[in-house]
């Protein structure tokens, strides 16, 4: 016999207060503190009730209603999920990994007897950078990054991280072998 989850009692004003505050937060560009602002709003709207705070976090971050709600409140909750789940997830990602590389693209140009690469890097936080390299600079950059991976291998956490990307390392090896055979 399955038990029906208990119905959570939430003041109707909580949904209005939450919606108003979330609209205010996301009316400006998402930055490193946006997720913290979201956390503060949830804690304030929960008025010290940990169970309610957990419910609101799960609802807004993962789109899940962990407990039953009355029909009207369920509709309000679904509306908040539709409006704010994605911006909240983006804010969380920027908060946790904002400076990490999100995307890299390169274009190759021929310039006076040499190949030049226009490398565009986009970070999780949306900032973009242009890095121009030629073949020699590209090799220097690869050598530097490979030495960083070798350094990571000497650290237990780094070694574990490298084991997790073994397929990528095998692919790199194959690419290096292909490059050295053709030169």
UniProtKB/Swiss-Prot annotation:
<protein>
    <recommendedName>
        <fullName>Protein CT_584</fullName>
    </recommendedName>
</protein>
<dbReference type="Pfam" id="PF17435">
    <property type="entry name" value="CT_584-like"/>
</dbReference>
<comment type="similarity">
    <text>Belongs to the chlamydial CPn_0803/CT_584/TC_0873 family.</text>
</comment>
<dbReference type="InterPro" id="IPR035397">
    <property type="entry name" value="CT_584-like"/>
</dbReference>
């Amino acid at each position: 016999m399955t038990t029906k989850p208990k119905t959570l009692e939430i003041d109707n004003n909580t949904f209005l207060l939450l919606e108003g505050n979330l609209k205010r937060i996301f009316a400006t560009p998402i930055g490193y503190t946006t997720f913290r602002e979201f956390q503060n709003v949830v804690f304030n709207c929960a008025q010290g009730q940990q169970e309610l705070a957990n419910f609101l976090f799960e609802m807004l971050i993962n789109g899940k209603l962990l407990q039953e709600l009355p029909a009207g409140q369920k509709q309000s909750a679904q509306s908040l999920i539709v409006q704010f789940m994605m911006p909240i997830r983006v804010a969380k990602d920027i908060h946790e990994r904002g400076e990490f590389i999100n995307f890299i693209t390169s274009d190759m140009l021929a310039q006076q007897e040499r190949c030049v690469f226009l490398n565009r890097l986009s970070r999780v936080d949306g900032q973009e950078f242009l890095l121009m390299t030629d073949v020699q600079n590209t090799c220097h950059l690869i050598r530097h990054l490979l030495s960083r991976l070798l350094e990571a291998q000497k650290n237990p956490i780094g070694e574990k991280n490298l084991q997790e990307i073994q397929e990528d390392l095998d692919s790199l090896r194959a690419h290096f072998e292909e490059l050295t055979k053709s030169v």
